[in-house]
């Protein structure tokens, strides 16, 4: 089966529908994926860029970003590396009110049973249950 990587810009057009004619391109690809004609692929960097753009440029609130991006990540129309890590990161991003990339790092760490982090960013990481910040002094 043909695999097709989907870039951030197509997801953004689809999620915001600010350019409906471009949003339709991803709708068409999803339909083709659902029919088994191709397999759509995306990675964690694409979703980090989606979250950042929705938050910074489109000014979407975290709960809306969590809701709409989680729906895409959970969709079987896409082959997404680290799907479980992304879903946890989206939940923590919203529920713990932390930066998405920090939530992703914490989720990635927890998946690998790492519970200590050396960081200067105590603000976000202290909010994550089960993680401890290493004393750097």
Predicted features by range, described:
Residues 1-42, 57-63, 70, 137:
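Short, well-structured N-terminal submotif of metal-dependent ribonuclease cores
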Residues 41, 79-81, 134:
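General small-molecule cofactor/ligand-binding pocket signal
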């Amino acid at each position: 089966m043909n695999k097709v990587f989907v870039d951030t810009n197509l997801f953004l057009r689809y999620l915001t529908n600010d350019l409906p004619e471009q949003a339709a391109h991803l709708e068409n690809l999803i339909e083709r994926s659902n029919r088994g004609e191709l397999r759509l692929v995306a990675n964690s960097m694409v979703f980090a860029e989606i979250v950042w753009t929705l938050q910074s440029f489109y000014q979407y609130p975290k709960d809306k970003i969590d809701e709409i991006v989680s729906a895409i990540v959970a969709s079987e129309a896409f082959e997404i590396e680290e799907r479980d890590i992304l879903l946890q990161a989206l939940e923590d991003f919203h529920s713990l009110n932390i930066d998405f990339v920090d939530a992703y790092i914490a989720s990635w760490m927890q998946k690998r049973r790492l519970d200590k982090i050396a960081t200067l960013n105590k603000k976000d990481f202290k909010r994550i249950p089960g993680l401890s910040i290493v004393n750097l002094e």
